[in-house]
Amino acid sequence: MSDDYELKELQPPEGANCNYNINTPQYENNNNNNNNTSGNESPNILNSENQFNQVANELENDSKQFFSNQDPEMNVEHSNVAQNEQDFKLRSYFENSQRIALGNGQKPKKMGISIRNLTVVGKGADISVISDLSTPFVTIFNLFRPSTWRKSSGSTFDILHDVTLFNRDAEMLLVLGRPGAGCSTLLRVISNQRSSYVSVSGDVTYGGINSDEWKNFKGESIYTPEEDTHHPTLTVRETLNFALKCKTIHNRLPDEKKKTFRKKIYDLLVGMFGISKQSDTLVGNEFIRGLSGGERKRLTITEAMVSSASITCYDCSTRGLDAASALDYAKSIRIMSDTLHKTTIASFYQASDSIFNLFNNVAILEKGRLIYFGPVGLAKQYFLDLGFDCEPRKSTPDFLTGVTNPQERKVRPGFEGRAPETSSDFEKAWKSSDLYQVMLQQQLEYEKKIELEQPSTNFIEQIRNENSKTNPTKSIYTTSYFTQVRALIARNSQIIWGDRFALISKYISIIVQTFVYASLFYNMKSDVTGLFNRGGAIYAAILFNAFVSAGELGLTFYGRRILQKQHSYAMYRPSALHIAMVITDIPLTAIQVTIFSVIVYFMYGLQVDAGKFFIFLFTIFGSTLSMVAFFRALGNLSPSLYVSQNILNVFILFMFTYGGYSIPKNKMHPWFSWYFWINPFSFPYKALMANEFGDMNFTCNDQTAIPNGNYIASNGSTMSYQDQYRACPSAGAIEGQMVNGEFYVAGSNYIDAALDFKSDDRTLNVIITFLWWIFFVIINMIALELFDWTSGGMPHKVYKRGKAPKINDDEEERQQNAMVENATSKMKDTLKMRESCFTWNHIHYTVQLNGKDLLLLNDVEGWIKPGQMTALMGSSGAGKTTLLDVLAKRKTMGTVTGKCLLNGKELNIDFERITGYVEQMDVHNPGLTVREALRFSAKLRQEPTVSLQDKYEYVEQVLEMMEMKHLGDALIGSLETGIGISVEERKRLTIGIELVAKPHILFLDEPTSGLDSQSSYNIVKFIRKLADAGMPLVCTIHQPSSVLFEYFDRILLLAKGGKTVYYGDIGEKSKTLTSYFERNGVRSCTESENPAEYILEAIGAGTNPGVSTIDWPEVWKQSPELQDVQAELASLETAATVQISSDDQDHGPPREFATSIWYQTWEVYKRLNLIWWRDMSYVYGIFTQAAASGLIIGFTFWNLDLSSSDMNQRVFFIFEILFLGILYIFIAIPQFLIQKAYFKKDYASKFYSWCPFAISIVIVELPFVAVAGTICFFCSFWTAGIYYNGEYDFYFYITFILFLFICVSLGQVVSAFCFNVMLAQTILPLLLVMLFLFCGVLVPYEQIPNFWKFVYHSNPCRYFLEGVVTSVLKNVFVDCSNEDLTKFSNPTNLTCKEYFKPTYGNVRAVTKGDESECGYCVFKSGEEYYKTLGWSYENRLRNYGILWAFFIFNIIMVVSFVYLTKKPNR
């Protein structure tokens, strides 16, 4: 092949202010569009000035975007436009703005890019394997195996290999390639996002600035990913106005106000992208209704344009847009690139020729290698000359990427064996071409021009001029820190108000829980019997407000991706975001705390004193703020939510235990006592205890004071105890202390003696509480500035250990292509389709909307036969998916009428099982491999008479046929985590899961939705293979290319309202279809036109929607084609033309499920157990929590002795063990909800019934929970010195494990009942309040209000505590320590025992020191202690049985709720 090129200079149209006068190579070939040009003919060069003029004129004439309300500050002399004049064209606006800016001293930032020898190295597939619970042990074992040391780092591969290209300012570069070609990586590297790769070598310069120095200009080269990441509760206006506030430049036009400038730009951009009408619509997401997917994509693009970056990289930014919107978007960035000298690099999904021709150059990648870089006008001819052929009506971008696909490319006669086959072949051909040398010369000249003109000098100067004058000289931010904070405060307020329903729900939940708290401690006694309760009530108030703030942890991770994106756009400093959040927290927290405090303070019966009330309010306010900041700090310092939750659980346990309530400060062991001094709970607790107890006296009557009654003097006379030697039975009591004839304990003495708190420290503790808040705020600011936990790399696959495929060399690549061809040729023998015919007639579907019937399908009929591929098309809202749902029996709401017949017979209960339904969303369990998912489908959906070996062999055949053999042992994973298979591979897997079931018919809903052109082609071609193998199928498809449309045999076209427009054959080159419309009054369809777009346009549903003057449904009703359809339907329904095979008859009567309930349960359990086994973060998370909780609790209550205070400590030891169970309630909920979503999808296809799932998911948790409980038991039980004898210890152990089972199953009950996590989080807090507060420890049974006593009797925590506490304290004799004694003077010459004997007996009086002072010990045994709680040792076996009843009841509830919610609402 000989390629002759020359350089010609292109001149822009007269008057166009664009930088298009670049040296661009063009072919000198008048027949450059001729697909049959011989490879020996030398291409010549076309002068493309006419082509450019045509594009420029089209942009000028077709631009429908207008700028209204022209600001008076614009230079009217130049624009000749009045103030309120409209119809101001987009290009004219930009050109006018640019002229005015130049007159004002502003110059465009002309920053192109130049890349030489760029190689990006990524991690190979073997560098990470599928992790499971054995992974840590394997890792440790490998440390002692020298043979594994070298391999530990894993292999690497080149994501990009030796890429050299450039792009001038004001030019647009299109990057094309198949999935995995490296397009996204190239765009990321150009945007200077390199952290996720092993290494990046080569030179990348930005207007002469190298990549290291370019880091100082964050926001000047941005990467816009294909995902749309926005705050869902903001409107379009709020989202863009915020971006504009952060990016409003300083050097605006003279006297131009910021607000005017922002409004002008906003109106321009929303008009440009057609989202003006959606300005006040919420952005929304999958849970919040808002913008459509296409509208959200346009918002993403608009936000990127607001950033005003010099270099912008758009990665598949047209995904989800229709053809018209994509073209408008491309035109807009073309104009902006021309007029504002912006450098644009973009990769597109399914780019049309119209979009393609807007770009200057195109770079084509294949497996990381650059196989073409040059002008768009030369690309097609280049590959034609290499020996490839382009099909008629195939777009140029599809052709360019198609040549890299062995299944798609077509080699012209005479080039067999000569045309490139592998990626390296293509790269060699490119580097040996003359055009490659021309482009190298162009790049060299561009670099010399950069060196001569030094655009970086002007670039740096313009950045300084644009930035706020209050910013530091080297600041990368446009606006000042104060402006950023102010904008963020406004945005945070809008986010909260946008989701005001959640805010109101939160306050309602708080009010309800507050009344529960307050009613439990209602009107507490002010005597000594209420001392402990009063302290508990105050501590509960602190805990409640702290844990209400725990939701901030999840919100921190939710907003992380948005922060990363906007920070990469240099909109604001991350620390400014936190300052703004803190400021918006203050009023919201004040409302929350005020509501809580007003209710609680007065219902508690705390001192009615204004000063004390406001100190209470102020302290709770500071404590809540500090905990909000603490939870955020934990999130900002953690790489993932799982990590932060595990750390949080440890902290919560520490904070609760070492707050000074459950363990007094003087009882804390030295190894953990230090935490008391850094505990955010301890300081507000000390402050509030001092506030309440500091000047309050707690009385006791004569009967309660000790000693009371009489004693026998040494002379034998009976004497009364003297008041000056009596006191209240409480810590801090002073003998003889009385007021108004009653003994009392001063509150200040009590908190000093019992808790070691000083009432004088109240003010200091309040101040420290707020200092904690400030400390955590600073930590958050530092963390946000220093850490970026978001991953920016490409998703990667992980395989089973030792199963990762090798990186193919050229020979292996050729062999793999040959294997695919061989598998394809054998497809018909592999599939062995049952020939079935499915018909539907007079289908109507009605739903209720606002009390009225809404008809969504109106008299639809049709059929699918073996070997036929039927397309289902129509405008948006025509009912395509609705019809498929009805035909596949997936509708659970509404009313369906009409007849659906399979082989001329009514549908049986096995219809869903024998029918394959490929839904639009690819829902797969991420914890399985591809092969495991396919085998699971085959085992449960194929007939039980088929052997397991045959099922597995069939799976392998389908894997090979789907070209996924190398992915069999790859983890499915998820796109969100960046680990797993690609989008296209997921779509293939979705189809494969239906195929291995050997379905009779196949329904496919939008199988190409969201895929690039090559993936779409591969999917449709694969579906065609299924049809050729005898599979009857129907497939909805949205605006297919002309090439894809040719694969279909028949089409069912629907209009809005679910009415039939046409049903029949498409015909060769779509002649049958187009002739129907032409004959009924529509213009002729040209040879070059896409028939799919033609028919949609004809019925007013094309990419440019219009109003058709023809009533097409009525035309269809009067057409002879309808009569033919009805006649054929009648024939099919009466004749049953396709007979049921003898194999089917042998299977017996129809069954809803192919296998027995026991087999289903076993298989579902095995799958769930495998998923749990691989979920290291979940399982090791619960193990870690168990070990950490056990060690913390065990060493906190280290080696408890037999004093009376340690009796209380033993109870609190067991009470804190409950924390692990409560924790597992939280942990079980998200795991259950995730698996429940997969169950609903499986149940719809009749994999298995609801009962196997419910039973299996309960059982699968139990072994892991039992191990966790065992770990906690061994870490805590003997450490605390609780052991007494084997019988009691064993009872403790088995009861504890059973209690954990109850907690996990209780979490599953909540999950089975709830539809989502948000509802579960609303229910949980109230549930946990009931479990914790009404268990009989914090508030004894006698002190619980009568209204709430039913909760105590229905609380599993009560039965666990009663059984375990009585076992632990049984036969324990109390030996009071000196600190536990209530001491009295002995005014007699009697011994202490003699002095107390008449009233208390010998065992109750303990002498300490000499006989002049006696000590009184409250309890003589553990049994006496637990009887004060109303518990009995005799109830322990009963309690154990009741706990089993709770567990069984929970299982029944799980099964019941799963049954009731087994079908999604659709």
Swiss-Prot record:
Residues 23-47 are annotated as: Disordered. ATP binds at residues 874-881. It holds the Pfam family PDR_CDR. Residues 23-45 have a biased composition (Low complexity). GO terms for biological process: aggregation involved in sorocarp development; response to bacterium; sorocarp morphogenesis. SMART domains: AAA (SM00382). One of its GO terms (cellular component) is membrane. It is a multi-pass membrane protein. It comes from the Eukaryota. Belongs to the ABC transporter superfamily. ABCG family. PDR (TC 3.A.1.205) subfamily. This is ABC transporter G family member 10.
